[in-house]
Amino acid sequence: KAVLEAFNATEVEYKVNLTRKAAREWFSGNLSFEFNASPPQRPGRPDKPELIAPQDMPRRRNAKARAARIAMLHAIAHIELNAIDLALDIVVRFGADMPKEFTDDWIKVADDEARHFSMLNNLLIEFDSFYGAMPAHDGLWQSASTTSHDLLARLAIVPLVLEARGLDVTPAMIKK
């Protein structure tokens, strides 16, 4: 229930806090996961960012410019928010059929991604911006939807291909 509540949360800080709390409770043995809930088709999301088609995303020009840095931080924060939901979804959707260690690993992934999102969101705030200030695309979650019936496809497509590609195709990220 705690994992599903985090998945459904629509406010990002609340989602992060619920995810981190669920991880602490899971690893301290205070959370019993009964795997009797099925996740909705989409995670809870805030009203912003506006989700647009990947081909309609604005191009980032000068990576040294403040606006380009904010855009890059926002894009990475969006990937991390999706990664939280992908990890939570995989626990709820496939955990009942897997050993406990599977759930342990994916709860840890969700906790790590929540921590990463928080760090990026704090950087955005330092730049006088915030998560949701810029548009984003829904490609990661669309792939999750198409693999919702098949654990192996999900494990191959989403974390190994799309998330890595999302981080690797940015020239400034490759350089760093």
Explain the meaning of each model-derived region.
Residues 1-176:
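Non-heme di-metal
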